[in-house]
Amino acid sequence: MMELDLLTAISPIDGRYRGKAGALASYFSEFALIKYRVQVEIEYFITLCELPLPQLKTLDSSRFDSLRAIYQNFSEADAQRIKEIESVTNHDVKAVEYFIKEEFDKLGGLEEYKEFIHFGLTSQDINNTSIPLSIKEALEQVYYPLIEELIDQLNAYAEEWANIPMLAKTHGQPASPTRLGKEVMVFVYRLKRQLAMLKACPITAKFGGATGNYNAHNVAYPAYDWKAFGNKFVAEKLGLEREEYTTQISNYDNLGAIFDAMKRINTIMIDMNRDFWQYISMEYFKQKIKAGEVGSSAMPHKVNPIDFENAEGNLGVANAILEHLSNKLPISRLQRDLTDSTVLRNVGVPFGHIVIAIQSSLKGLRKLLLNETAIYEDLDNCWSVVAEAIQTILRREAYPHPYEALKALTRTNQAITETSIKEFIETLEVSEDIKKELRVITPHNYTGI
């Protein structure tokens, strides 16, 4: 079997694109998941001590720092030790429990407290807190800064190109002129709105025992309010919100909402990448050329919009996986089946493709060279677009059948030029003031507000 490295990795995220997506390993790798599990187990144990349970009253709080160091200083060697234990237990979360017990032995003086590690919990109390925590931190530390960098770049272009008139295209055909900056601002507006909706989605966790009822906790210590304990632990120690009513596993409804929100943002980015691709095809933009790069193995002249194409492809893959995650995870037979387990292990995959896509989008945007001449000429060659302006003013003046008159003039296979428009204006039976108003309208100034 081949040794795993960038060349032998099956996934391009861990192979070809590792340099772009590698930061996500701190959140979604096997190592990261194990570390998050250790963190949750340790913080849970400390919270039981703070309650305190009668048997934990004698554990001095000065030891908490050394307990937290178990996950704060967690190493690859530690993760390997857990995998060794798992090879015997054939259970990943139980292996974490046994590892922590070993660490307690190394610290010394904790023997009598070890059975309160993972006390009253099921594996999903650890998984359904660890994974939401990893998603929360990946969003906050990687995704949000990157998507906001993209929005900032688009916003800068929107301001820079605010006053550049441009021929609009609806159905691929000339339409009322617009401004390049405004068209870029459309994407800024859309992304900001959907990003706000994503940030508003609560990141929730399941924490309630084997079937969500705190059975084990309640039978051992019936005097405690375990729901209040769970709410406080999940909120204060993990920064998450506890789901009040669950089966053995999370309901995943809120996680599904997060994935759906990310999917909508991806769809906007696909739209954006396709538009810039099209503008390049229309020669509204040229691209900065980097010495030594090759655009085609056969055609030496090629400078292709590969960054926008790469982004579009990766976003499509991400959306396909996000769609499955949001559709599948909320469905589980009775109090739970195991289908969520293997699916959840793929949560980092769409994040990887999204991170790659945003970086590719940024790279493509930063290579753009505005071709104002092409934009001007395209607009100047399409005087038919002022027909809307003329017929609207004529309507205002109660001119008979203005729409039909302009339709007869412009809906033809003949070229409509500045001359033909101005000649038409002279034939109109309107006042000289109205004609003056009509004469000043051009494709370059008929751009709205």
Residue locations for each model-derived region?
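Glycine-rich anion/phosphate-binding loop at the beta-strand->alpha-helix junction
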Residues: 194, 241, 247-333
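Proline-centered turn/helix-capping motifs that create local helix->coil transitions or kinks
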Residues: 105-111, 199-202, 281-284, 319-323, ...
